[in-house]
Amino acid sequence: MQTLKVDLGERSYPIHIGEGLLDQPELLVPHIAGRQVAIISNETVAPLYLERLTRSLGQFSVISVVLPDGEAYKNWETLQLIFDGLLTARHDRRTTIIALGGGVIGDMAGFAAACYQRGVDFIQIPTTLLSQVDSSVGGKTGINHPLGKNMVGAFYQPNVVLIDTTSLNTLPSRELSAGLAEVIKYGLICDEPFLTWLEENVDRLRALDQQALTYAIERSCAAKAAVVGADERESGVRATLNLGHTFGHAIETHMGYGVWLHGEAVAAGTVMALEMSARLGWITSQERDRGIRLFQRAGLPVIPPEEMSEADFLEHMAIDKKVIDGRLRLVLLRRMGEAVVTDDYPKEVLQATLGADYRALAQLKG
């Protein structure tokens, strides 16, 4: 087992990474203050792991709330089901909420923990690659609004993150690829040697090689933990973690939440960010193509939806958390391995990026 630390002073917490950790309650018990525990899961994950986790926490009074699965349910109505379960069971301020599932479950359970009786303890047990390398670390919680993704939420850090890598053995290949989008992101924004490693090992990752997966998760979490420790509330460097997300969130919102998986939209959105970086002369076309090839090898889309117009993108991108005083800030690559957040770009370059021929770019060879 590997243990990393998110350094936030008195609110610091560990990230445990390894095989079979669901069967090691001693990793969770020190982070549960009261006797009440509420496990939040979904209809896909609960049949696989809920009974096992409940059994390992036998010394506590445990309830579970099983939600419908999917991004389409990341809303107020589903959030209320969590509160209904907590209140019906008379859970008090010393309860601990455990998120058992992917990014949607983690975001909603964390938001519920932030809100319930003005804040209760919270534990993340992510079961998808995307949630293990990204959303479970850093304290971003929330729900979607029909007009914009993740526009309602709170920063609320967990007590501990428990990553059992064997949970990926039951993950569908499409979900695994979606998680790889966030892994690749770390190589692009802050760790070019890791990007090279990913190019050499992406096939092992897709084949669920445990050694390769564990290494990729550790390296991704270490990068995320370092950024969060330096900028918890995204006032500076943390925003670079959103490479591809402004374009990607526009895709998710326009197409309908859940039609494109988050990682799929991030992949296509990152290709758009690479294209814009190349048009600005910050990276070469060969470096742009390097990123495109890796996304393709990871089984991810690199072409945005053809039914989305430039106007569609601009409409959705105007409702983005990085918009400040009406100026759209974008995360772009100054060079491979170095991302910047900027609103200093010619409008015509953004328009050209939105109108680029991504189908032609997707045909590149080599």
Curated annotation (Swiss-Prot):
EC identifiers of the protein: 4.2.3.4
Ligand binding (NAD(+)): 69-74, 103-107, 127-128, 140, 149
Compartments (UniProt record): Cytoplasm
Cofactor note: Binds 1 divalent metal cation per subunit. Can use either Co(2+) or Zn(2+).
The UniProt record lists the keyword Cytoplasm: yes
Functional pathway: Metabolic intermediate biosynthesis; chorismate biosynthesis; chorismate from D-erythrose 4-phosphate and phosphoenolpyruvate: step 2/7
Protein name according to UniProt: 3-dehydroquinate synthase
Organism: Pseudomonas fluorescens (strain ATCC BAA-477 / NRRL B-23932 / Pf-5)
